[in-house]
Amino acid sequence: MDSQRNLFLVALLFVSFLIWQAWQTDHNPQPVAQTAGQSISDTASQAVPESGQGKLITVKTDVLALTINTRGGDIEQADLLAYPATLGSDTPFQLLETTPQFVYQAQSGLTGKSGPDNPANGARPLYSANQTSYEMLPGQDELRIPLTYTAANGVIYTKTFVLKRNDYAIAVDYKVKNDSHDALDLTLFGQLKQSVDLPKHRDTGSNNFALHTFRGAAYSSSDDKYQKYSFSDIEDKNLNVQTKGGWVAMLQQYFATAWIPHDSGVNTFYSANLGNGQAAIGYKAPSVSVAPNTEKVLSTTLWVGPELQSDMAAVAPHLDLTVDYGWLWFISQPLFKLLQLIHSFVGNWGFAIIIITFIVRGIMYPLTKAQYTSMAKMRMLQPKLQAMRERIGDDKQRMSQEMMALYKTEKVNPLGGCFPLLIQMPIFLALYYMLMGSVELRQAPFALWIHDLAAPDPFYILPILMGVTMFFIQKMSPTTVTDPMQQKIMTFMPVIFTVFFLWFPSGLVLYYIVSNLVTIIQQQLIYRGLEKRGLHSRDKK
C-alpha cells in the first residue's frame, strides 16, 4: 500500500472528523435527563426572575474585575485581567456581561417557602453595601464584600463574597439571622444564565470548522463525571438531576463559570429556557430550616475564569474535565502535562511543541520503520502480483485467495504500511484538542510573525511550508501507483493539504512541519537499511 495514499486517506478522515464534530457540537444527541421526586416543571419554575434596578458595586483583585448588582446580589460582569480580549489589546477579556446585546450572569440566592429570592415573595432582595467600590490592595490576600438585606419580618440576610489573591474561585456565604417569631424554610441556589445567540463581538470562530469548539452548559454528578448539555438540549427538555456533590457550569473555549455546591445532601441540578433568547443551568441545595432567634450560614463556590486544569481540580472533583479534550482526553492530558514540563525549561510554547514532536516521533520510530519495511516488501511483490493478475484474469475470488497465499508465503502484511499511520492519527487529533482546549496556549507567541499558536497563521506561511515538506516527502518516496487518476491525486496532495491547513491552529501546523522533517530524516535512514537488505533501490521512484 502506497504511503502517499495512506497519508491522503488519513488527512481526509481527519478533516471529515472535524467537519462532523463542528456539526455535532450544535446538533449533539440530547443526554437523558434523570428524574426523581420533583418534577421538571417545578424545577424550571425556580429560574430566577430579572434582577431589576439596583446599584452596581465594582470589585477588583489582581486577576478579576467584577460588577455586582445589589438587586439580588448577582455578578453581572466579570473581566479577566490577565487575559487580553484580543492579541495585543489592553482591554481584558470579558467573561460575564450584561448589555442589551448579550447577557451572561452568575446568580445566586435563597428560595424555598421563606426565601427572599422566591418569586412568590415579591421582588428580589435589594441589598445594601458599605462601599460602592472594593479593591484588593498590595499585600492583601483576601477581599470580602458583605451585602446586607433586612426583610419585613426582621430577618437579616448577609451575602458575602470572598475573593482571594490569584484565585478565580469565589466563596459566596449567606448568613441568616432569624429575629422573627417563625422558622424559616430556605433553599440555596446557584444559577448561570446566558444569551443563546452570540453577538459579533463575542463570536471568535464559529464559522471556521477547524476552530469550532463547544459552547453551552455542562454538569458533573455522581453518575456522570462530565456531561455536556447544549443550548438545544435545554430548549428541548429541562434538566432535572438529583445528586450528591457535583457542579453545574457554562462553558466556552478556554473559559468557564461553574457553581459548586457545598451541601453534602442531595442537590437538584436543573436547566431552564428563560425566553428572550436566554437559557440557564443551576442547582438547588436541600431545604434548610432556621429556627427563630438563631443564625445559620449557607455557602457555595463560584468559579469564574480560565480553564486552568490543576486549579479547577483543586476546587471540585472533575471540574478540570471542562477543558474540552474530546474523546481523546486520555491522550491529550498526558501530552499537555509533558508539554507543560518542556515549557518550564524552554519558556516558549512553540519550541515546546517542536521538542514534543521529536519525542513522539522518536517513540514511534519502530512503527515507522515497520511501515516502510512493509511497503518495501509490497513493492518487491508487485511483479508477482501483476503476473498473477494476467494469469487469473477476472476471477476475483481466486485472485484474492492466491494473493493471501502469496502474502503468507512471503510473510508480508498488506496492511502493515497503513497501521502505523492509524496509530499516529489519534496522537495528531489529541494534539489538536490540546491546542484548542488549553488556555495556556491562547495567544501564546512562538517566533517572528507567529504571535498566537492557537490561531491560524495570518500570512499562511506555515501551511505553505508544510505543503513544501509534503512535496519533498512525495518526491523521495517510491510509488507503485499506476492508475493515471490516482497519480494526479497524489501530485496535488501537497496542495490539498496546504488548503486544508490554512484554517488550522499555527501550533498544529508547526507540529506537522516538524513531523514531516523528521519523516524525511527517518525515511533516508530506513531506506539505507533497506538497500542493504535488497528491499529498496534509489533508482526506483
Swiss-Prot record:
Entry keyword annotation includes Transport: yes
Record's GO cellular component terms: plasma membrane
Location within or outside the cell: Cell inner membrane
Protein's membrane topology: Multi-pass membrane protein
PANTHER family attached to this UniProt entry: CYTOCHROME C OXIDASE ASSEMBLY PROTEIN COX18, MITOCHONDRIAL, OXA1
Its biological purpose: Required for the insertion and/or proper folding and/or complex formation of integral membrane proteins into the membrane. Involved in integration of membrane proteins that insert both dependently and independently of the Sec translocase complex, as well as at least some lipoproteins. Aids folding of multispanning membrane proteins.
Official protein name in the record: Membrane protein insertase YidC
Gene assigned in the entry: yidC
